[in-house]
């Protein structure tokens, strides 16, 4: 266990770091169960594509009757399948607009709890679609599970970011992405023909997404609400004190409350902002642009094109068993996300994001070369595997985990919910565009499709290098000061601390 996970005693009057308590572990685990579902439903639609399309055709024939014109037209089937993939993102786009409203109205924990109703509804519709001979039910189920995931994509990083100690905020924030990629990997494994990816069992493959929802409904009531939300937003000192005691394991949290009172006093001049107020705010324009571009760098990097269509990409690259190669990419995905958990508090957010973008750009160029030379050099199929594995690995070093939690770091308590909504909508809009349009772009551009992503990745690298600040080890107030141009705060020595502990000046300064 890294040393950062241990409680560090006070030295020279410096407040101790918050140790990792059982309550903190339970709260983070319960929250990221939502991210696990998010990832599962990204990956689950890929492997069983052919058997689901066959089911669509059977439904079509059943509705036409024996005197009908025959099998479903290829163009109609392509459209139905693209809609089945992309409607997930439509649900996410719509629900992401509600992140700020719901998180302020219900609170972070209760919002995640009630969100599970969408997961249960979506999973039930998808699981019963074959029995009901209705591809509309499957598409509608994908919409509801997408709406669930859209809320999850904002609520989970917000909750984890607000309960996490500053010195672990990056590592715990990265667990959100680790849960997503673990969900993708589980979906890829269960989607094999030897598992649930068969003509008979694919409804079960899609329907079991209700299981983590039910588990989260059991665990979340045992977890504390965000003390920042309770005290700063709801002005509930008693419940906030109780929540702090459970999260920190400290009997005396008076200094923590003093810090929250000071932050609340400052934020009284910065009321919670609506979406329109945030978009019109000159003060928050720069961090908002950064938040949006970081979300674009995640989605327009091409990673979802790889996951949505990985099997067909490996087939076109000449790989004999593309489903297993896809699972290999999922394993790489998970391993390198785990690596980023340990790197993010050492190397920093900005450095890892730059490294990831540069590596992905190189792998995209390598993938283009491999696809161009495949017919003349059969060994290029192996190069394509290396390129995709490298592409996935570099994604999980930076562009995968960083954008999700850095948005919560760039904004103070007042504008944070609205900022999460804007960033989430940007992410889901790009997700939809890739899911709906990649196949058409790939057909038009052929082997050069990944060159397009390489150009975009280069642009995102330049933007990150020029505009994105480092947030590692800084409190929310210190990060906010970057955009308010307060040099005195920027020049402060970054000391180990937690967002839920005393932030006052060091006695020796």
UniProtKB/Swiss-Prot annotation:
Subunit structure: Binds to DAXX. Interacts via its N-terminus with SRFBP1. Interacts with NDUFA9. Interacts with TRARG1; the interaction is required for proper SLC2A4 recycling after insulin stimulation.
Extracellular side: 46-81, 133-142, 193-200, 309-323, 375-384, 439-445
InterPro entries on file: Glc_transpt_4, GLUT, MFS_dom, MFS_sugar_transport-like, MFS_trans_sf, Sugar/inositol_transpt, Sugar_transporter_CS
Domain observations: The dileucine internalization motif is critical for intracellular sequestration.
Job description of the protein: Insulin-regulated facilitative glucose transporter, which plays a key role in removal of glucose from circulation. Response to insulin is regulated by its intracellular localization: in the absence of insulin, it is efficiently retained intracellularly within storage compartments in muscle and fat cells. Upon insulin stimulation, translocates from these compartments to the cell surface where it transports glucose from the extracellular milieu into the cell.
PROSITE patterns: MFS, SUGAR_TRANSPORT_1, SUGAR_TRANSPORT_2
UniProt modified residues of type Phosphothreonine: 486
Region annotation (Interaction with SRFBP1) ranges: 7-13
This protein's name: Solute carrier family 2, facilitated glucose transporter member 4
Domain of life: Eukaryota
Chief location bin: membrane
Cytoplasmic side: 1-24, 103-111, 164-171, 222-287, 345-353, 406-417, 467-509
Gene Ontology process terms (BP): amylopectin biosynthetic process; brown fat cell differentiation; cellular response to insulin stimulus; cellular response to osmotic stress; cellular response to tumor necrosis factor; D-glucose import; D-glucose transmembrane transport; dehydroascorbic acid transport
GO cellular component, one term: insulin-responsive compartment
Motif Dileucine internalization motif in this chain: 489-490
Entry's transmembrane regions: 25-45, 82-102, 112-132, 143-163, 172-192, 201-221, 288-308, 324-344, 354-374, 385-405, 418-438, 446-466
Family of the protein in this entry: Belongs to the major facilitator superfamily. Sugar transporter (TC 2.A.1.1) family. Glucose transporter subfamily.
PTM annotation (Phosphoserine): residues: 10, 274, 488
Pfam families assigned: Sugar_tr
Note from the entry: Insulin-stimulated phosphorylation of TBC1D4 is required for GLUT4 translocation.
